[in-house]
Amino acid sequence: MGNFHATTIFAVHHNGECAMAGDGQVTMGNAVVMKHTARKVRKLFQGKVLAGFAGSVADAFTLFEMFEGKLEEYNGNLQRAAVEMAKQWRGDKMLRQLEAMLIVMDKTTMLLVSGTGEVIEPDDGILAIGSGGNYALSAGRALKQYASEHLTAKQIAKASLDIAGDICVYTNHNIIVEEL
């Protein structure tokens, strides 16, 4: 069986609000759409944290569980939980094989977490990952910069994924947006 791709996640902090959006498409290999309604963005830690994944679906579930465990262990401290998870992910021979990336955020902090040990906080309050990530990132930056007072974080997140879905064949328009 081929590789499964779970595609685009976009997150934004904007005017005191935060939102994360993900599309619903799961693609096997380069040819077959297997699912249109996957849910790739979740609320964690009593609804105080958002997390979204791009990459292998099975690996993402493992990472969600691991990250939620770290949040519990560090009492909701997002940065500490992300750093400790990245250390464990990078240091464990089996976990290193996982093929996924995560964006995690709370009301004040947004982080990209990867299996190579990176924990990156963006300078501009915007992150995007997955096959349509660059398209969503570009759209989100333009929307945030040029329509800032006219759009909410949720509207920016939704519009950025819509634009990515128009361009990227691995991103669809079944968009789920979560807010904190």
UniProtKB/Swiss-Prot annotation:
GO terms for cellular component: HslUV protease complex; proteasome core complex. It is found in: Cytoplasm. GO terms for molecular function: metal ion binding; threonine-type endopeptidase activity. GO terms for biological process: proteolysis involved in protein catabolic process. Allosterically activated by HslU binding. Gene3D superfamilies: Glutamine Phosphoribosylpyrophosphate, subunit 1, domain 1 (3.60.20.10). Na(+) binds at G165, C168, T171. Keywords: Allosteric enzyme, Cytoplasm, Hydrolase, Metal-binding, Protease, Sodium, Threonine protease. It holds the Pfam family Proteasome. The active site is at T7. The keyword Glycosyltransferase does not apply. Its EC number is 3.4.25.2. It comes from the Bacteria. A double ring-shaped homohexamer of HslV is capped on each side by a ring-shaped HslU homohexamer. The assembly of the HslU/HslV complex is dependent on binding of ATP. PANTHER family: ATP-DEPENDENT PROTEASE SUBUNIT HSLV, METALLOPROTEASE TLDD. Protease subunit of a proteasome-like degradation complex believed to be a general protein degrading machinery. Belongs to the peptidase T1B family. HslV subfamily. This is ATP-dependent protease subunit HslV. It comes from Bacillus cereus (strain AH187).
